Amino acid sequence: MSRFAVEANKAAQALSTTTTDYTNASLIFYQQGLSDAEVAKRTEVTVKMANAAGQSTQVVSDQLTAVWNNFYDGSKSLEYYADVMTALGAATASSTDEIAGGLEKFAAIGQTIGLSYEYAASALATITANTRQSEEVVGTALKTIFARIQGLNLGETLEDGTSLNKYSQALQKVGISIFEQNGEIKKMDNI
């Protein structure tokens, strides 16, 4: 434990943060059973994003965990995910915290239905910026929409009689087609 304290103190100094903030950020990653090296990488990204967003490291570590657990496939750096949220927060009337908090609500279902991280983050930032609804409201609404489409994608008819065909017709009226030429449902990124 004393070795961890020394290492955490050194890492915190290098990142211009407190040892307490560093350990708060790393706790969730250790609880996930990650290696020391992986915890150090994730904690560094977490501390940097927390500093940029003006948010606590504990909150940011929870938010990034939801994003990484659902979108990270090794093809991009861990830092990339934080950079996208920070850039979108700077470019829109949304904040990094709003984007991360909203993504936390629907990340698990977003990837399942073919929604990329970039589109998920962009959709959330756009809706939050334009409506000024909270990230909880927007994230939960997107989760509900995606869950319904996923269920319908599997052939289910909802208790209110809603079917994929009904959704398809409503979207077609506003010029959005959800089907590929071969009849398969498009990935969410393409819809």
Where are these regions (language model features)?
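Intrinsically disordered, low-complexity polar regions and short flexible loop motifs
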Residues: 189
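Conserved catalytic-loop aspartate of Hanks-type protein kinases
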Residues: 142
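Active-site capping/gating regions of soluble enzymes
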Residues: 121
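Extracytoplasmic, non-cytosolic globular domains
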Residues: 124-129
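Glycine/charged-rich beta-loop-alpha catalytic/anionic-binding loops adjacent to active sites
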Residues: 103
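Short edge-strand/loop segments of extracellular domains
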Residues: 145-149
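A short, structural motif
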Residues: 1-83, 87-100, 110-118, 130-139, ...
